[in-house]
């Protein structure tokens, strides 16, 4: 597809008809037929599914660094693993990845190891549903997950035991961006940052009605947990009607505290437990300018074990919270 001898201008519309994804080229007088699609040709190849490749995974396997995989409108039943750096995986219309007949993960961005991460992978404009986990970014850096609808992913074998049922999850991921997604009705929780995920930004997502299967993690909308999960930003999200807490920062017992995380400008409304919770030795985090309303327990209950001196709390809105601020595992700060 690469052609560096372009001398004239071609205007192209990618016409995806009957799942073929054939490009429709309108050529100005005197110009050569050369589809430009939606980006510079020198950026890499464009691989079309299903026109050029029957499955998304076969296109991923053929892609090199800098390539874009454009998936045409349709319903696809497959698990997708992306391990090549700088690959862009994009839905080109109403693209559904359905796991009704499958188990496991819908889309898994997976590096070789924590020290050899996949870099710069993008996943955008997909509906991912009915898997055990929706989109997982693991051993990766500078990934981008945006404009996806991730819903109804549940633990199919042993609810609340195996840890399945998350919508979007970052595991040992760094400097990545999760934005403008809708994450709904996933069995365990909505968005999770775990196990040494650092310097990530989670922003402008809607996270609602997650956690109907959960007991261990209490159906958290956005969970920040695990040793070394530090210096992340959770901002401008709307977290509504989850079965547990809206936002939770908590480290497992016996591990180093979470620190340096920023939780700001979020709206946590009508969650069945606290709107925002800081628990189990999460220290030195900043929680400012959030709006927590109509949650069934206190808007923000720091745990007895937290280092409150290092915890900066201010500018939050707390009203219309139900209950008497008497969670068994937390005290209330107003």
Task: Enumerate the predicted regions with their spans.
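Extracellular beta-strand/beta-solenoid scaffold signature
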Residues: 100-113, 130-137, 157-172, 185-194, ...
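The right-handed parallel beta-helix/beta-solenoid scaffold, focusing on the short coil/turn
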Residues: 45, 67, 78, 85-87, ...
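Leucine-rich solenoid repeat scaffolds
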Residues: 284-334
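Extracellular beta-strand solenoid repeats
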Residues: 70, 81, 88-90, 98, ...
């Amino acid at each position: 597809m690469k052609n560096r001898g372009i001398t004239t201008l071609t205007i192209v519309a990618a016409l995806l008809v009957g799942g073929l994804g054939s490009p429709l080229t309108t050529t100005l007088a005197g110009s050569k037929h050369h589809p430009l699609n939606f980006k510079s040709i020198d950026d890499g190849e464009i691989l079309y599914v299903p026109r050029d490749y029957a499955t998304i995974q076969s296109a991923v396997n053929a892609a090199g660094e800098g390539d874009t995989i454009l998936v045409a409108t349709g319903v696809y039943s497959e698990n997708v693993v992306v391990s090549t750096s700088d690959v862009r995986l994009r839905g080109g219309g109403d693209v559904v990845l359905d796991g009704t007949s499958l188990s496991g993960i819908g889309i898994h961005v997976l590096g070789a190891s924590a020290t050899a991460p996949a870099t710069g992978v993008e996943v955008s404009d997909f509906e991912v549903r009915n898997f055990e986990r929706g989109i997982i970014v693991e051993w990766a850096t500078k990934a981008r997950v945006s404009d996806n609808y991730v819903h109804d992913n549940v633990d199919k074998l042993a609810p609340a035991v195996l840890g399945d049922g998350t919508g979007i999850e970052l595991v040992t991921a760094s400097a990545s961006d999760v934005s403008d997604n809708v994450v709904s009705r996933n069995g365990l929780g909505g968005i999770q940052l775990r196990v040494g995920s650092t310097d990530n930004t989670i922003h402008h997502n809607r996270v609602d009605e997650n956690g109907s299967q959960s007991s261990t993690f209490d159906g958290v909308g956005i969970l920040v947990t695990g040793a070394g999960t530090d210096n992340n930003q959770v901002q401008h999200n709307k977290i509504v009607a989850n079965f547990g807490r809206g936002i939770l920062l908590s480290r497992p017992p016996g591990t180093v505290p979470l620190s340096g995380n920023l939780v700001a400008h979020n709206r946590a409304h009508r969650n069945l437990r606290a709107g925002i919770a800081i628990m189990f030795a999460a220290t030195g985090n900043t929680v400012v300018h959030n709006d927590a309303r109509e949650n069934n327990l206190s808007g923000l209950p720091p745990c007895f074990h937290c280092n409150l001196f290092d915890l900066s709390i201010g500018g939050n809105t707390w009203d219309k919270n139900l209950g008497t601020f008497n969670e068994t595992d937390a005290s209330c700060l107003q």
